[in-house]
Protein backbone atom coordinates (compact mmCIF):
# COMPACT_ATOMS: atom_id res chain seq x y z
CA UNK A 1 0.00 0.00 0.00
CA UNK A 2 1.17 3.51 -0.75
CA UNK A 3 2.82 5.45 2.09
CA UNK A 4 0.79 8.54 2.98
CA UNK A 5 3.92 10.64 2.98
CA UNK A 6 4.28 9.93 -0.72
CA UNK A 7 0.82 11.27 -1.60
CA UNK A 8 0.01 13.92 1.01
CA UNK A 9 2.05 16.69 2.59
CA UNK A 10 -0.06 16.59 5.80
CA UNK A 11 1.90 14.39 8.27
CA UNK A 12 -1.33 13.43 10.13
CA UNK A 13 -3.09 12.19 7.01
CA UNK A 14 -3.92 8.46 6.83
CA UNK A 15 -5.45 8.45 3.38
CA UNK A 16 -3.14 5.65 2.32
CA UNK A 17 -4.42 3.44 5.16
CA UNK A 18 -8.08 4.50 5.43
CA UNK A 19 -8.82 5.80 1.98
CA UNK A 20 -10.43 8.96 3.41
CA UNK A 21 -9.12 12.48 3.81
CA UNK A 22 -8.06 13.61 7.31
CA UNK A 23 -9.69 17.01 6.61
CA UNK A 24 -12.91 15.42 5.23
CA UNK A 25 -12.29 16.43 1.61
CA UNK A 26 -14.36 14.31 -0.75
CA UNK A 27 -13.10 13.29 -3.22
CA UNK A 28 -9.66 13.06 -1.62
CA UNK A 29 -7.88 14.61 -4.59
CA UNK A 30 -9.78 17.85 -3.92
CA UNK A 31 -7.64 18.32 -0.79
CA UNK A 32 -4.94 20.97 -1.41
CA UNK A 33 -2.38 18.82 0.42
CA UNK A 34 -3.11 15.63 -1.52
CA UNK A 35 -0.42 14.82 -4.07
CA UNK A 36 1.63 17.94 -3.30
CA UNK A 37 4.52 16.01 -1.75
CA UNK A 38 4.80 13.77 -4.78
CA UNK A 39 4.63 16.69 -7.19
CA UNK A 40 7.23 18.67 -5.26
CA UNK A 41 9.66 15.76 -5.38
CA UNK A 42 9.48 15.48 -9.15
CA UNK A 43 12.39 16.93 -11.12
CA UNK A 44 10.92 18.62 -14.18
CA UNK A 45 14.37 18.54 -15.83
CA UNK A 46 15.24 20.12 -19.14
CA UNK A 47 15.42 18.74 -22.63
CA UNK A 48 19.19 19.10 -22.77
CA UNK A 49 19.58 17.08 -19.58
CA UNK A 50 17.68 14.18 -21.12
CA UNK A 51 20.24 13.64 -23.86
CA UNK A 52 22.56 10.68 -23.43
CA UNK A 53 25.64 11.70 -21.41
CA UNK A 54 29.13 11.09 -22.67
CA UNK A 55 30.03 9.38 -19.41
CA UNK A 56 27.78 7.24 -17.19
CA UNK A 57 28.12 6.05 -13.63
CA UNK A 58 27.10 2.67 -12.26
CA UNK A 59 27.47 1.76 -8.59
CA UNK A 60 29.65 4.83 -8.19
CA UNK A 61 32.00 3.81 -11.00
CA UNK A 62 32.38 6.13 -13.99
CA UNK A 63 32.02 4.34 -17.32
CA UNK A 64 33.58 5.57 -20.56
CA UNK A 65 31.36 6.00 -23.58
CA UNK A 66 34.03 4.39 -25.82
CA UNK A 67 33.24 6.97 -28.49
CA UNK A 68 35.72 9.22 -30.28
CA UNK A 69 37.86 11.57 -28.21
CA UNK A 70 36.80 15.16 -29.02
CA UNK A 71 39.24 17.97 -29.68
CA UNK A 72 38.40 19.42 -26.26
CA UNK A 73 39.49 16.21 -24.55
CA UNK A 74 42.64 15.22 -26.43
CA UNK A 75 45.08 17.29 -24.35
CA UNK A 76 43.85 15.76 -21.11
CA UNK A 77 43.98 12.30 -22.71
CA UNK A 78 47.57 12.78 -23.85
CA UNK A 79 48.51 13.95 -20.36
CA UNK A 80 47.22 10.65 -18.96
CA UNK A 81 48.32 8.29 -21.73
CA UNK A 82 51.68 8.19 -23.49
CA UNK A 83 50.47 7.84 -27.04
CA UNK A 84 51.85 8.71 -30.45
CA UNK A 85 49.59 10.99 -32.50
CA UNK A 86 48.94 10.15 -36.14
CA UNK A 87 47.25 12.79 -38.28
CA UNK A 88 45.36 11.63 -41.37
CA UNK A 89 45.47 14.45 -43.92
CA UNK A 90 43.56 14.26 -47.15
CA UNK A 91 40.87 15.96 -49.16
CA UNK A 92 37.44 14.56 -49.93
CA UNK A 93 36.99 10.88 -50.81
CA UNK A 94 40.61 9.84 -50.37
CA UNK A 95 39.62 7.11 -47.90
CA UNK A 96 40.45 8.45 -44.43
CA UNK A 97 37.33 7.13 -42.69
CA UNK A 98 37.47 3.89 -44.66
CA UNK A 99 41.07 3.40 -43.53
CA UNK A 100 40.02 3.74 -39.88
CA UNK A 101 37.25 1.18 -40.35
CA UNK A 102 39.60 -1.21 -42.13
CA UNK A 103 42.28 -0.93 -39.44
CA UNK A 104 39.77 -1.94 -36.78
CA UNK A 105 38.51 -4.77 -38.99
CA UNK A 106 42.02 -6.15 -39.45
CA UNK A 107 42.65 -6.13 -35.71
CA UNK A 108 39.35 -8.01 -35.24
CA UNK A 109 40.82 -10.86 -37.29
CA UNK A 110 44.18 -11.00 -35.51
CA UNK A 111 47.60 -9.34 -35.46
CA UNK A 112 48.43 -6.62 -37.97
CA UNK A 113 52.06 -7.15 -38.87
CA UNK A 114 53.92 -7.51 -35.60
CA UNK A 115 51.21 -5.75 -33.59
CA UNK A 116 48.44 -7.38 -31.57
CA UNK A 117 45.35 -5.50 -30.42
CA UNK A 118 45.16 -4.92 -26.65
CA UNK A 119 42.36 -2.40 -26.09
CA UNK A 120 40.76 0.83 -27.27
CA UNK A 121 39.04 3.69 -25.50
CA UNK A 122 37.11 4.44 -28.70
CA UNK A 123 35.91 0.91 -29.42
CA UNK A 124 32.27 1.88 -29.99
CA UNK A 125 33.16 4.39 -32.71
CA UNK A 126 35.53 1.94 -34.40
CA UNK A 127 32.82 -0.74 -34.47
CA UNK A 128 30.25 1.76 -35.71
CA UNK A 129 32.37 2.77 -38.70
CA UNK A 130 33.11 -0.82 -39.63
CA UNK A 131 29.42 -1.70 -39.39
CA UNK A 132 28.44 1.21 -41.63
CA UNK A 133 31.10 0.22 -44.15
CA UNK A 134 29.58 -3.27 -44.46
CA UNK A 135 25.90 -2.42 -43.90
CA UNK A 136 24.76 -2.81 -47.53
CA UNK A 137 25.65 -6.31 -48.81
CA UNK A 138 24.88 -5.24 -52.39
CA UNK A 139 27.85 -2.88 -52.57
CA UNK A 140 30.84 -4.17 -54.49
CA UNK A 141 33.23 -1.90 -52.57
CA UNK A 142 33.03 -0.65 -48.96
CA UNK A 143 31.60 2.81 -48.43
CA UNK A 144 31.82 4.70 -45.15
CA UNK A 145 29.94 7.90 -44.26
CA UNK A 146 32.15 10.92 -44.83
CA UNK A 147 33.20 13.07 -41.90
CA UNK A 148 31.16 16.27 -42.20
CA UNK A 149 32.68 19.69 -42.84
CA UNK A 150 30.87 20.93 -39.73
CA UNK A 151 32.41 18.29 -37.47
CA UNK A 152 35.39 19.21 -35.33
CA UNK A 153 38.43 16.96 -35.39
CA UNK A 154 38.04 13.77 -33.35
CA UNK A 155 40.51 11.09 -32.35
CA UNK A 156 40.53 7.29 -32.27
CA UNK A 157 42.66 5.34 -29.78
CA UNK A 158 44.37 1.95 -30.03
CA UNK A 159 46.56 0.19 -27.50
CA UNK A 160 48.64 -2.65 -28.96
CA UNK A 161 51.67 -4.77 -28.28
CA UNK A 162 54.59 -6.17 -30.21
CA UNK A 163 56.06 -8.99 -28.17
CA UNK A 164 56.37 -7.63 -24.64
CA UNK A 165 56.35 -3.99 -25.73
CA UNK A 166 53.14 -2.01 -25.30
CA UNK A 167 52.40 1.11 -27.33
CA UNK A 168 49.43 3.40 -27.88
CA UNK A 169 48.37 5.63 -30.74
CA UNK A 170 45.66 8.19 -31.36
CA UNK A 171 44.54 8.83 -34.94
CA UNK A 172 42.84 12.04 -36.03
CA UNK A 173 39.67 12.16 -38.10
CA UNK A 174 38.77 15.46 -39.77
CA UNK A 175 36.70 16.23 -42.84
CA UNK A 176 38.40 16.39 -46.22
CA UNK A 177 36.73 19.73 -46.89
CA UNK A 178 38.72 21.28 -44.04
CA UNK A 179 42.01 20.30 -45.69
CA UNK A 180 40.76 21.51 -49.06
CA UNK A 181 39.77 24.86 -47.56
CA UNK A 182 43.21 25.19 -45.93
CA UNK A 183 44.91 24.54 -49.27
CA UNK A 184 42.85 27.25 -50.95
CA UNK A 185 43.15 29.73 -48.08
CA UNK A 186 46.30 29.24 -46.00
CA UNK A 187 44.89 31.49 -43.26
CA UNK A 188 42.79 28.45 -42.32
CA UNK A 189 45.81 26.20 -41.77
CA UNK A 190 46.03 27.34 -38.15
CA UNK A 191 42.60 25.82 -37.51
CA UNK A 192 44.01 22.33 -38.16
CA UNK A 193 45.00 22.10 -34.51
CA UNK A 194 45.83 18.39 -34.59
CA UNK A 195 48.93 19.04 -36.70
CA UNK A 196 50.75 20.63 -33.75
CA UNK A 197 50.37 17.33 -31.87
CA UNK A 198 51.54 15.12 -34.73
CA UNK A 199 54.23 12.49 -34.47
CA UNK A 200 53.28 11.35 -37.97
CA UNK A 201 51.31 13.13 -40.68
CA UNK A 202 49.89 10.74 -43.26
CA UNK A 203 48.82 12.31 -46.55
CA UNK A 204 46.38 10.07 -48.41
CA UNK A 205 47.04 9.88 -52.16
CA UNK A 206 44.18 8.53 -54.30
CA UNK A 207 45.95 6.23 -56.77
CA UNK A 208 42.83 5.75 -58.88
CA UNK A 209 42.45 9.49 -59.43
CA UNK A 210 46.16 9.97 -60.02
CA UNK A 211 46.40 7.33 -62.76
CA UNK A 212 43.33 8.34 -64.77
CA UNK A 213 44.17 10.36 -67.86
CA UNK A 214 41.30 12.78 -67.23
CA UNK A 215 42.15 13.62 -63.62
CA UNK A 216 45.91 13.10 -63.38
CA UNK A 217 47.18 16.61 -64.36
CA UNK A 218 45.00 18.52 -61.91
CA UNK A 219 45.14 16.00 -59.08
CA UNK A 220 48.92 15.58 -59.17
CA UNK A 221 49.31 19.35 -58.79
CA UNK A 222 46.67 19.68 -56.05
CA UNK A 223 48.18 16.90 -53.94
CA UNK A 224 51.58 18.58 -53.83
CA UNK A 225 49.95 21.91 -53.03
CA UNK A 226 48.14 20.34 -50.08
CA UNK A 227 51.42 19.17 -48.54
CA UNK A 228 53.23 22.39 -49.34
CA UNK A 229 50.50 24.57 -47.77
CA UNK A 230 51.05 22.86 -44.41
CA UNK A 231 54.84 22.85 -44.51
CA UNK A 232 55.22 26.44 -45.72
CA UNK A 233 53.00 27.65 -42.88
CA UNK A 234 55.02 25.76 -40.24
CA UNK A 235 51.96 23.74 -39.23
CA UNK A 236 53.87 20.45 -38.89
CA UNK A 237 56.48 19.95 -36.13
CA UNK A 238 59.98 19.31 -37.47
CA UNK A 239 60.10 16.16 -35.34
CA UNK A 240 57.14 14.64 -37.20
CA UNK A 241 57.49 11.97 -39.87
CA UNK A 242 55.76 12.69 -43.19
CA UNK A 243 54.12 9.73 -44.90
CA UNK A 244 52.25 9.38 -48.15
CA UNK A 245 49.73 6.53 -48.03
CA UNK A 246 48.80 5.52 -51.57
CA UNK A 247 45.14 4.47 -51.22
CA UNK A 248 42.86 2.67 -53.69
CA UNK A 249 45.91 0.99 -55.16
CA UNK A 250 43.70 -2.01 -55.96
CA UNK A 251 41.69 0.16 -58.38
CA UNK A 252 44.66 0.96 -60.61
CA UNK A 253 43.91 -0.83 -63.89
CA UNK A 254 46.38 -2.36 -66.30
CA UNK A 255 47.74 -0.11 -69.00
CA UNK A 256 45.66 0.39 -72.14
CA UNK A 257 46.06 2.51 -75.24
CA UNK A 258 49.76 2.93 -74.59
CA UNK A 259 49.24 4.10 -70.99
CA UNK A 260 51.07 2.54 -68.05
CA UNK A 261 49.35 3.55 -64.77
CA UNK A 262 51.82 1.73 -62.53
CA UNK A 263 54.73 3.45 -64.22
CA UNK A 264 52.95 6.80 -63.84
CA UNK A 265 52.44 6.09 -60.14
CA UNK A 266 56.08 5.15 -59.61
CA UNK A 267 57.20 8.30 -61.42
CA UNK A 268 54.96 10.48 -59.24
CA UNK A 269 56.16 8.79 -56.07
CA UNK A 270 59.72 9.62 -57.06
CA UNK A 271 58.73 13.25 -57.68
CA UNK A 272 57.35 13.39 -54.15
CA UNK A 273 60.55 11.93 -52.70
CA UNK A 274 62.67 14.43 -54.60
CA UNK A 275 60.55 17.42 -53.54
CA UNK A 276 59.66 16.61 -49.95
CA UNK A 277 62.44 14.24 -48.97
CA UNK A 278 64.77 17.24 -48.91
CA UNK A 279 62.41 19.39 -46.82
CA UNK A 280 64.05 18.52 -43.51
CA UNK A 281 61.49 15.88 -42.56
CA UNK A 282 61.76 12.12 -42.55
CA UNK A 283 59.68 11.15 -45.59
CA UNK A 284 58.11 7.77 -46.42
CA UNK A 285 55.69 6.35 -49.01
CA UNK A 286 53.52 3.24 -48.52
CA UNK A 287 50.97 1.62 -50.82
CA UNK A 288 47.82 0.31 -49.16
CA UNK A 289 44.42 -1.07 -50.11
CA UNK A 290 41.41 -1.86 -47.95
CA UNK A 291 40.20 -5.43 -47.50
CA UNK A 292 36.98 -5.92 -45.50
CA UNK A 293 36.60 -9.62 -46.33
Can you say where each PLM-predicted feature lies in the sequence?
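Long, basic/Gly/Ser/Thr-rich N-terminal segments
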Residues: 1-62
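Pre-Walker A adenine-sensing motif
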Residues: 66-79
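Glycine-rich phosphate-binding P-loop
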Residues: 84-109
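Flexible phosphate/Mg2+-sensing switch loops adjacent to catalytic phosphate-binding sites
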Residues: 107-148
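Switch II (G3) loop of P-loop NTPases
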Residues: 164-189
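Inter-motif core of Ras-like GTPase G domains
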Residues: 183-213
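Amphipathic helical hotspot of TIR/SEFIR-family domains
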Residues: 213-236
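Canonical P-loop GTPase G-domain recognition
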Residues: 243, 249-293
